[in-house]
Amino acid sequence: MEMTEASKQTTAEGSANPEPDQILSPRRSLELKQKKWWISVSLCIFLVLLGDSLVMLLLNFFYVQDNREDSDQDLQYRGTWLQALVQNAAFPLLIPLFFIFPSPKQNQETTNTRFLSFRLILLYISLGVLVAAHSKLFALGKLYANFGVFTLISATQLIFTAIFAAIINRFKFTRWIILSIIGSILIYVFGSPEFGGEPDENEEFYSIQAWLTFAASVAFALSLCLFQLCFEKVLVKTKRYGNKKVFRMVIEMQICVSFVATVVCLVGLFASGENKELQGDSHRFKKGETYYVLSLIGLALSWQVWAVGLMGLVLYVSGVFGDVVHMCTSPLVALFVVLAFDFMDDEFSWPRIGTLIATVVALGSYFYTLHKRNKKKMVELYQTENNIDV
């Protein structure tokens, strides 16, 4: 009996005065979680850079080899449904990854599962149509607009992303994020790579190119914010994810949205009659039909790499951050294009070298905000666990 009372007293004392390891375990758990988060964000940034670089290199290769300059004006602006399709069609390769990535423990307390599933299906369809529209507009804008017009108008997409994020996602801006946004826009304007498929001076349709590029920018900005809304308000609350953000959600989103976008682009391809011109396009390709097919396959894979990385940044951080990273990759992509091609005596000039330095500042400003946010969580946990004011 005495031993029992002594053991109870010891247990009570142990509960009142827990060991240091017990006190620090929540902090260690949060530190580990934050390290995993930083690794995930870094991986997504790498995927965006890799995908963006491969897309621009292969797009330039495709249009250089396509004998575009020797075609009549009407034919030069064809093939945009094919390019829109290529941006989305490689999603089946992501299906094995969906089953490889682990799924969190299901939340058995989730209610209204049918309502959530219905909302999710509607969002997937809506986002798929929006992505298909952006893909088509992007392909048209690239061909109709010259380099200067396309770059200047495309830079406004980050402004629209910020506006939509404030309205749709209730995004809170800090002075460091605003600095990052301004820097990213300037980086994109002065550091974007040249494009081999842009029109000659006598081919330009100034009113058309401006509106096409503008519409593509708005569609892209809106899609980023809607992706974030879908992640935070719908997908994360489903029973299978149990209120946890995991990379498997990115794969699911990309597969479902790309499926809808692919269907829309296929309908457009056959309805416009572009499918009948595919054989002629392959015959005009300078490197031959084999390289024509391989370049399209490479483009399709590269677009998926880029999209998965971008979607991951939207999940782990925000749509604004995803767009900032996308724009900040432009100087490095331009460097790769300059090394691989020679367009109109294009070179990696001093303004572009300056944008590389500005990229460090722009991303550093946003990273500083993320660091402060994570540090604040650590301080709050320290206060809670130690019951003191800091």
Curated annotation (Swiss-Prot):
<keyword id="KW-0597">Phosphoprotein</keyword>
<dbReference type="GO" id="GO:0005345">
    <property type="term" value="F:purine nucleobase transmembrane transporter activity"/>
</dbReference>
<dbReference type="GO" id="GO:0015211">
    <property type="term" value="F:purine nucleoside transmembrane transporter activity"/>
</dbReference>
<keyword id="KW-1133">Transmembrane helix</keyword>
<feature type="transmembrane region" description="Helical">
    <location>
        <begin position="250"/>
        <end position="270"/>
    </location>
</feature>
<keyword id="KW-0813">Transport</keyword>
<feature type="transmembrane region" description="Helical">
    <location>
        <begin position="148"/>
        <end position="168"/>
    </location>
</feature>
<dbReference type="InterPro" id="IPR030182">
    <property type="entry name" value="PUP_plant"/>
</dbReference>
<feature type="transmembrane region" description="Helical">
    <location>
        <begin position="81"/>
        <end position="101"/>
    </location>
</feature>
<dbReference type="Pfam" id="PF16913">
    <property type="entry name" value="PUNUT"/>
</dbReference>
<feature type="transmembrane region" description="Helical">
    <location>
        <begin position="211"/>
        <end position="231"/>
    </location>
</feature>
<feature type="transmembrane region" description="Helical">
    <location>
        <begin position="176"/>
        <end position="196"/>
    </location>
</feature>
<protein>
    <recommendedName>
        <fullName>Probable purine permease 18</fullName>
    </recommendedName>
</protein>
<feature type="region of interest" description="Disordered">
    <location>
        <begin position="1"/>
        <end position="23"/>
    </location>
</feature>
<comment type="similarity">
    <text>Belongs to the purine permeases (TC 2.A.7.14) family.</text>
</comment>
<feature type="modified residue" description="Phosphoserine">
    <location>
        <position position="25"/>
    </location>
</feature>
<keyword id="KW-0472">Membrane</keyword>
<keyword id="KW-0812">Transmembrane</keyword>
<feature type="transmembrane region" description="Helical">
    <location>
        <begin position="120"/>
        <end position="140"/>
    </location>
</feature>
<dbReference type="GO" id="GO:0005886">
    <property type="term" value="C:plasma membrane"/>
</dbReference>
<feature type="transmembrane region" description="Helical">
    <location>
        <begin position="297"/>
        <end position="317"/>
    </location>
</feature>
<feature type="transmembrane region" description="Helical">
    <location>
        <begin position="39"/>
        <end position="59"/>
    </location>
</feature>
<dbReference type="GO" id="GO:0016020">
    <property type="term" value="C:membrane"/>
</dbReference>
<dbReference type="GO" id="GO:0006863">
    <property type="term" value="P:purine nucleobase transport"/>
</dbReference>
<feature type="transmembrane region" description="Helical">
    <location>
        <begin position="324"/>
        <end position="344"/>
    </location>
</feature>
<feature type="compositionally biased region" description="Polar residues">
    <location>
        <begin position="1"/>
        <end position="14"/>
    </location>
</feature>
<feature type="transmembrane region" description="Helical">
    <location>
        <begin position="348"/>
        <end position="368"/>
    </location>
</feature>
